[in-house]
């Protein structure tokens, strides 16, 4: 009997294995959305992808996206590790503000603001305080059993107040070429912030994928009970990821403040924690913990930054910017949802899977006679 034709009536042509493998890759949809945003900007501004060399530095919209997206990439990097353990860190925005405020305050009051020792000391102070914030978050979550959203929400509010106390509610301006290098300098024609972010992403990826750390994080986030039964000490691991998250936020704060040569305790890092969570989710990491994707997080952060650039290019009114961003992010999340894609595919095809039709009774009888003459 001739087998049914897959392209006949009542059937949908099956996708090639290569296509299924490509679309099933966790980085496919974030990369596709990023490419669509870039192509949309090209349609609006034909020289959007143009990169030129001026005064020995690379300039262009793509370079701007990478440079201004570097702080968000770092914050999202630490947020990914926290979310992978079924946690959340809402204090990263305040940590960004505190780090920038401490560094600028130290440089502004130093005898030699432009010297390397002064800048180095400012960086150490900022990173040290950020590590203490991460330790406090980890202690509240791992040792005292406080819900992560509650523990970090406390420091989100208190940390913003600390940043305002450091700056006395004013904007602290500094003049230090060495400090400016962190967020606004160039090295080998590329923005130093981009190189620094790429290096930290590479190191984090190497540590989490080439050592047992990544497996332990996924184990604790995927099944805390089972990981505890096999002897994994989750408390120390949780403290570690919160410290890493705070340090990433501190470096982002140094980038932001050095790029503008000032610290604003009121607005620096404001709502960056929400953009970081969006970047992590858009990148394919589930808020329920477990498996995580650092590459997807980087793509998610670039999507958020490209979206912000697109909003300015379109001239969207400021009062509707957040609504516009939310709508686009919802679309991105739906596109990545396997259930949504399956439902959309069924509706667009117009036909569901074919139910096998039983062979007529006469054919069955004839076959039996052939087998048993």
Sequence positions of predicted segments:
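Cytosolic-side transmembrane-helix boundaries in multi-pass membrane proteins
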Residues: 1-46, 202, 229-236, 307-373
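Loop-to-transmembrane alpha-helix initiation sites
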Residues: 27, 148, 189-197, 238, ...
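Single transmembrane alpha-helix segments in multi-pass membrane proteins
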Residues: 41-42, 58-109, 139-146, 280, ...
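Inter-helical junctions in multi-pass inner-membrane proteins, predominant
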Residues: 48-64, 68, 163-166, 208-209, ...
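Alpha-helical transmembrane segments within multi-pass membrane transporters and channels
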Residues: 113-156, 300
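Helix-loop-helix "hairpin" substructures at the membrane interface of multi-pass membrane proteins
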Residues: 118-126, 133-137, 190-264
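Transmembrane alpha-helical segments in multi-pass inner-membrane proteins
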Residues: 249, 260, 264-326
């Amino acid at each position: 009997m001739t087998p049914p034709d897959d392209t006949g009536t009542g059937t949908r042509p099956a996708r090639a294995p290569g296509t299924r493998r490509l679309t099933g890759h966790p980085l496919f949809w974030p990369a596709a959305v990023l490419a669509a945003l870039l192509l949309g900007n090209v349609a609006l501004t034909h020289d959007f992808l143009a990169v030129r060399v001026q005064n020995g530095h690379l300039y262009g919209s793509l370079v701007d996206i990478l440079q201004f997206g570097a702080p968000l990439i770092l914050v999202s990097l630490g947020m990914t590790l926290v979310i992978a353990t079924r946690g959340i860190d809402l204090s990263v925005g305040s940590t960004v503000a505190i780090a920038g405020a401490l560094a600028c305050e130290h440089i502004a009051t130093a005898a030699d603001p432009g010297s390397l020792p002064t800048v180095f000391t400012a960086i150490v102070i900022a990173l040290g305080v950020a590590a203490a914030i991460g330790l406090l978050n980890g202690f509240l979550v791992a040792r005292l059993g406080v819900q992560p959203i509650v523990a970090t929400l406390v420091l989100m509010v208190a940390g913003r107040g600390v940043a305002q106390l450091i700056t006395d509610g004013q904007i602290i301006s500094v003049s230090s070429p060495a400090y400016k290098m962190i967020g606004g300098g160039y090295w080998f024609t590329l923005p130093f912030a981009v190189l620094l972010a790429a290096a930290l992403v590479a190191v984090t990826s190497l540590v989490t994928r080439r050592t047992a750390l990544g497996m332990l994080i996924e184990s604790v986030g995927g099944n805390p009970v089972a990981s505890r039964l096999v002897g994994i000490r989750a408390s120390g691991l949780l403290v570690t990821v919160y410290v890493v998250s705070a340090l990433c936020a501190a470096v982002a704060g140094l980038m932001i403040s050095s790029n503008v040569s000032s610290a604003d305790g009121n607005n620096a890092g404001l709502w960056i924690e929400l953009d970081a969570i969006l970047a992590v989710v858009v990148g394919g990491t589930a808020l329920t913990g477990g498996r995580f994707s650092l590459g997807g997080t980087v793509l998610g952060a670039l999507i958020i930054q490209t979206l912000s650039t697109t909003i300015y290019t379109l001239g969207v009114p400021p009062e509707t910017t957040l609504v516009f961003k939310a709508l686009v992010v919802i679309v991105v999340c739906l596109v990545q949802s396997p259930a949504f894609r399956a439902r959309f595919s069924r509706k667009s095809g117009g036909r569901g899977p074919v139910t096998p039709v039983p062979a007529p009774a006469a054919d069955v009888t004839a076959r039996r006679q052939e087998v048993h003459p």
